């Protein structure tokens, strides 16, 4: 059996639907690609590749719709979302659907509608995917030149890039319109413990919006993850949507400059590597966002952040012991520092004990008790509201800790419940997937650069076990 490595050889693919029963184009000799590199058979078959992409979109949307309906079917309104292992309903609730003051679910019908709409959409996409994969033209260049392309055609590639950017910009504006005009979105900072509201006075100042990008990613700075109000989030989407749309128009109307033509590799595998790299970055950022940010991901739906649960514990015991007569302002802990309250490195009054490391935390249930110099002692003595006590006790017992077998909470805690926070799931999954995508980026970037340099070989398959096995048929 002759082993073929080069990508530059066999492109013609016959399928069952082209009027012949010969199954060529499925094996290594006729295509130059082994079974596990099946997608590579579609490199120059734009029609079939379109089918693969549309079918893939159908699978994604089907999962969204089916999982959405599954969560609706299992949802218990009396329990918080984060106790029920939900990951889709919290996103819908954050967008302001079906919830009222304090994040209480008042109507699950919008969630049902969302699931059904996704299922119907997935059927349309699935049909389109199967049609283009099996029945439609193998290549689009001849019959539909607008949708056809050659990977090396730099002008066409940047036009496609432009169209994608415009679609992304439109997506960003969908959130803006929902927040401004279509009922508003859930604001965890609304007075009295959160509510749905329309976002009226957006932050459009470039100094504020782009200032986030200039922040340090560490500690109390937190780069863009430190955003703590919806005005900045929606204003940021206005900026981002506008940049994407104008950038898209720019890329459609212009051809790549000489420096870009020289610097970049212009092949299908190179574009794949660029995309994987971008998605890896998004995955890592999303991981940090869902783990630390309780404005974009309200704790009412996703459970408290780690720092929030820790500070909630300190607050809960401060309330208890103060009721029992402790003077929380002067009580000394076992280390000689304040037992309940101490000073931060910059002089603010903060919670004492182990939670001192989380003194940066800002949370809606805690902020009303701060004054100009951190926590206000007189407010802690006179102004603590019952809703703040209830919420902190709830958050204290729902820290985003837990193991794969769903035994949640601190490992040594005797009252641990069968609970793992959606924050743990979402942060971990996005980190792990982001890492996998990053490895894929390195792999495909290396192959694309090697191919461009003219020595692309792929994996040396001379000693692959499957080659010495008897054929399956």
Swiss-Prot record:
Sorted UniProt keywords: Acetylation, Chlorophyll, Chloroplast, Chromophore, Manganese, Membrane, Metal-binding, Phosphoprotein, Photosynthesis, Photosystem II, Plastid, Thylakoid, Transmembrane, Transmembrane helix
Please describe what this protein does. One of the components of the core complex of photosystem II (PSII). It binds chlorophyll and helps catalyze the primary light-induced photochemical processes of PSII. PSII is a light-driven water:plastoquinone oxidoreductase, using light energy to abstract electrons from H(2)O, generating O(2) and a proton gradient subsequently used for ATP formation.
Give the subcellular location: Plastid, Chloroplast thylakoid membrane
| Matches recorded under Pfam families | PSII
Maturation propeptide residues: 1-14
Positions of modified residues (Phosphothreonine): 15
Report the InterPro entries cross-referenced here.
Answer: PS_antenna-like (IPR000932), PS_II_antenna-like_sf (IPR036001), PSII_PsbC (IPR005869), PSII_PsbC_sf (IPR044900)
Q: Which GO molecular function annotations are given, in alphabetical order?
A: chlorophyll binding; electron transporter, transferring electrons within the cyclic electron transport pathway of photosynthesis activity; metal ion binding
Q: Where does [CaMn4O5] cluster bind?
A: 367
Residue list for modification N-acetylthreonine: 15
Give the species: Physcomitrium patens
Its quaternary organisation is: PSII is composed of 1 copy each of membrane proteins PsbA, PsbB, PsbC, PsbD, PsbE, PsbF, PsbH, PsbI, PsbJ, PsbK, PsbL, PsbM, PsbT, PsbX, PsbY, PsbZ, Psb30/Ycf12, at least 3 peripheral proteins of the oxygen-evolving complex and a large number of cofactors. It forms dimeric complexes.
User: Cofactor note from UniProt?
Assistant: Binds multiple chlorophylls and provides some of the ligands for the Ca-4Mn-5O cluster of the oxygen-evolving complex. It may also provide a ligand for a Cl- that is required for oxygen evolution. PSII binds additional chlorophylls, carotenoids and specific lipids.
* Protein name (database record): Photosystem II CP43 reaction center protein
Gene Ontology biological-process annotations: photosynthetic electron transport in photosystem II
Q: Which residues form the signal peptide?
A: none
**Name of the gene encoding the protein in the UniProt record:** psbC
- Write down the membrane topology: Multi-pass membrane protein
Any transmembrane segments, and where? Answer: 69-93, 134-155, 178-200, 255-275, 291-312, 447-471
Please verify whether the record's keywords include Hydrolase. Answer: no
What does the similarity note say? Belongs to the PsbB/PsbC family. PsbC subfamily.
Can you name a GO cellular component term? photosystem II
